[in-house]
């Protein structure tokens, strides 16, 4: 595995693969890798000739009072995991490599990015869309892989790629979970043992939402209220966002009527925000399927 730190070096390294018509699979991350990231890597390796992973903690997607400074970082550890996973290239730029001057160009998808998690984290998804579009321009991948745990992010990136005619196939990969159901996340390391035990309320709330919906609760306001009450049984958990949405468009649904729905949760346990989602209903939604941009 070759570790690369600059944009120019990366472009030079990928040039032979492009000339040979090889397909490049790209997994953008912020590092401190876990089983979920490694599943993205596995899919990228299976479906492409060359696999590239980026590790970049992007300051544009963190708010003023968020965890940019303490976000877990361990490049040596991550490089070892990626080497073992047989990744071809690791791109690990610095902030000055990615943003040598203050950014004046912002990529934003306001209707999708200002709701749900974006309502709790203003500007977050503009930062995500900006860095992902820049990485796509740098790497020029044939396919890029994102976890469905960050479902809103996946919808936004798909829409950005469609709107901007970026020639990359966006692949959503099913959420990878710990043995007790908690979604794998780099931020799980923030949790104390007591908080970690409490955090199981998040996937349990999705199970409860699934049960209630399949048993006939099809009023979105009633379902949101029931989920909030369920999470309220755990005193260490504070629900910040509970949203029932269309999984294709993220639009609010006046009535559910048995259609597939997205249940999105954004729950604070201690000082840690935990994100989880599930699509439930009677049919698999299009957004969870691979499709070409």
Swiss-Prot record:
A GO MF term: ATP binding
Pathway: Cofactor biosynthesis; (R)-pantothenate biosynthesis; (R)-pantothenate from (R)-pantoate and beta-alanine: step 1/1
Active site: 37
One GO BP: pantothenate biosynthetic process
Keywords: ATP-binding, Cytoplasm, Ligase, Nucleotide-binding, Pantothenate biosynthesis
GO cellular component terms attached to this protein's record: cytosol
Pfam families: Pantoate_ligase
Residues that hold ATP according to the record: 30-37, 147-150, 176, 184-187
E.C. number: 6.3.2.1
InterPro entries hit by this protein: Cyt_trans-like, Pantoate_ligase, Pantoate_ligase_C, Rossmann-like_a/b/a_fold
Function according to Swiss-Prot or TrEMBL: Catalyzes the condensation of pantoate with beta-alanine in an ATP-dependent reaction via a pantoyl-adenylate intermediate.
The protein's name in its UniProt record: Pantothenate synthetase
Gene field: panC
């Amino acid at each position: 595995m070759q570790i690369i730190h600059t944009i120019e070096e990366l472009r030079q390294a990928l040039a032979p693969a492009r000339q040979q018509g090889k397909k490049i699979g790209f997994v953008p991350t912020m590092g401190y890798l876990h089983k979920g990231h490694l599943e993205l890597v596995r899919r990228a390796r299976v479906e492409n000739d060359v696999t590239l992973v980026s590790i970049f903690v992007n300051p544009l997607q963190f708010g003023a009072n968020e965890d940019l400074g303490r976000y877990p970082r361990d490049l040596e550890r991550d490089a070892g995991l990626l080497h073992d996973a047989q990744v071809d290239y690791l791109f690990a730029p610095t902030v000055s490599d990615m943003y040598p001057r203050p950014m004046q160009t912002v990529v934003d998808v306001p209707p999708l990015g200002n709701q749900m998690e974006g309502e709790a984290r203003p500007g977050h998804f503009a930062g995500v869309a900006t860095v992902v579009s820049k990485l796509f321009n740098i790497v020029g991948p044939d396919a890029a892989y994102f976890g469905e745990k960050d479902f809103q992010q996946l919808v936004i990136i798909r829409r950005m790629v469609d709107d901007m005619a970026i020639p990359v196939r966006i692949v959503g990969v099913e959420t990878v979970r710990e043995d007790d159901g908690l979604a794998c996340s780099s931020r799980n390391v923030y949790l104390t043992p007591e908080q970690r035990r409490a955090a199981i309320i998040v996937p349990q709330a999705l199970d409860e939402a699934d049960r209630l919906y399949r048993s006939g609760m099809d009023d979105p306001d009633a379902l949101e209220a029931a989920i909030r009450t369920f999470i309220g049984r755990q005193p260490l958990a504070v629900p910040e966002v509970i949203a029932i949405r269309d999984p294709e468009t993220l639009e609010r649904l006046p009535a559910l009527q048995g259609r597939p729905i997205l249940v999105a949760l954004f729950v604070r346990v201690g000082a840690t925000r935990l994100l989880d989602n599930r699509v439930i209903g009677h049919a698999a939604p299009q957004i969870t399927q691979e499709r070409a941009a």
